[in-house]
């Protein structure tokens, strides 16, 4: 009986760790994506960091990833950049992998 309870606790701990890691990867991805978009819009320094935080916050609005993609596409188009949702999604996936690698190396 004890071994079953131990296994259950181990499973719950692993699940919690995996969920926290996924959250961190998503947050890192959104920050990197926001900084990429900020650069394309000509933002630098504190303005670029602030935009990165806006993108990060968009994840918590209804729609999640779609909201992030829509925000970046709309903001880039508003600044005169020619970009498609597919291009931004490609960058989103690229930064997800980059964020995951960064976190695994920390």
Q: What role is predicted for each listed range?
A:
Residues 1-106:
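A charge-rich, low-complexity, intrinsically flexible signal that marks solvent-exposed coils, linkers
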